Amino acid sequence: MTIELEVNTTASVELLVEGQDLASSISRESEDKFPPVFATARMVALMETAAARALSPFLESNELSVGVFIQVSHTAATPPGIKVTANARYLGREDKLFIFEVWAEDLGGEIGCGIHKRAVVNVDRLLAGATRRNAS
């Protein structure tokens, strides 16, 4: 694996917030009460996707990138029907990890930001390890 990702490379992904993206849709338990606004979990997933897209052109066919660390703040609510854009900017490497600054924004401005780290792994090895770890 030789990845020639340049510092400050960016990638973005957009999402129109719909019902399944809302915090109120996250839990399946009726006693859990969450507001009908863009869920933090969906924001994190969008940020991860942006970072993964920055790495994807450099991966071999048997590789993918996986998130191993994320630290974010979700600072503003977004209602359904609004477009959210998540962005990732490559900061550099820390040993085998690829470090990204991530942020998300809607029409009103920034809604969240943080740091995300990804590792590049062999798909077969990852799946075999996951299966082995959960074997009874």
What feature does the model see in each segment?
Residues 51-85:
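Hydrophobic beta-strand-centered segment that forms part of the acyl-chain substrate-binding groove
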Residues 12-18, 73, 117-119:
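Generic structural detector for well-ordered beta-strands
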Residues 79, 89-136:
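HotDog/MaoC-like acyl-thioester-processing domains
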Residues 9-13, 66-70, 82-86, 96-98, ...:
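A generic structural signal for short beta-strands and their flanking turns/coil linkers
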Residues 2-38:
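Catalytic strand-loop segment that frames the active site of acyl-thioester-processing enzymes
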Residues 20, 35-36, 57, 64, ...:
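Flexible, active-site-adjacent loop/turn segments at secondary-structure boundaries
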Residues 1-3, 135-136:
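Basic/polar N-terminal segments that are highly enriched at the extreme N-terminus
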